[in-house]
């Protein structure tokens, strides 16, 4: 037990979290040097006299490597995004609020709630005591960064940062270009294996093995997150669904325009919790990658700038880009549960 607690303290230390990204950069530098000098220059340029192929491969690999580092830097600089401070919702009717006197009354900074919001079994929205703010849908408080992250995905030890709504697209681009460059390394060396027999430096075979390992790790990672985006899921949501030990009940409070009441709907572990899937793969992808197809492949700080909206007493102005929209199909499913009287409680508006 003491050993596990000591290990936890070490792995959570900021310097330890920098160690793996630092080692990753060193391996990348070694791989680029071994490929460009030991393979391209010594094997292709000097031994095979393939000057065009040598220069072309060096330019492509160096360009992709610098692009990967640029994306990495953007992920660190931008961060995962921070949910704006959301004041308490006004869920109790004014007629039920009692004040002792006008002199002792506390100024009311509460705002009208949205039509749907995550809550507890009594209909109260989730409060983050660290950020002194309500936590909206898909938002989780991260101890790594010290604030609530909208559309929290996971903490990546390899790049050393938390992934959320703001830098998730960059992470997908990072894994895509990393897969691309290691594929180029593998294919280029594999096609020359027979000709290099007995003449190649050990560094060439080392970088080939390194590229194979990188592809085995980054390839499935990229495809997994493409799958998640196609169905509008995050890593933490998939873990909660698949891991029964971490599964928990979900509660949403929804306004029913038919009778003017708010209803608290419960979703148990194992029950359908596909809240955000819009039913169309392209629509789901656009929610993560944006509407501009070209920006899916071109990383830019401009396309990742987050807007919190204007300061206002209106929830949608406050939440800005962090607002998560539940699918129409699931909204209808919740209304159907209300009609079947499958709700926890009802609130007067």
From Swiss-Prot:
Membrane-protein topology: Multi-pass membrane protein
InterPro entries: Palmitoyltrfase_DHHC (IPR001594), PFA4/ZDH16/20/ERF2-like (IPR039859)
GO CC terms of this entry: endoplasmic reticulum; Golgi apparatus; membrane
Active-site residues from the entry: 156
The keyword Transferase is annotated on this UniProt entry: yes
One GO MF term attached to the UniProt entry: protein-cysteine S-palmitoyltransferase activity
Domain DHHC: 126-176
Keywords of the record: Acyltransferase, Lipoprotein, Membrane, Palmitate, Transferase, Transmembrane, Transmembrane helix
Any Pfam family: DHHC
EC number: 2.3.1.225
Coiled-coil segments: none
Entry keyword Disulfide bond: no
Domain notes: The DHHC domain is required for palmitoyltransferase activity.
Name of the protein in question: Palmitoyltransferase PFA5
Organism, as annotated: Kluyveromyces lactis (strain ATCC 8585 / CBS 2359 / DSM 70799 / NBRC 1267 / NRRL Y-1140 / WM37) (Yeast)
Gene giving rise to this polypeptide: PFA5
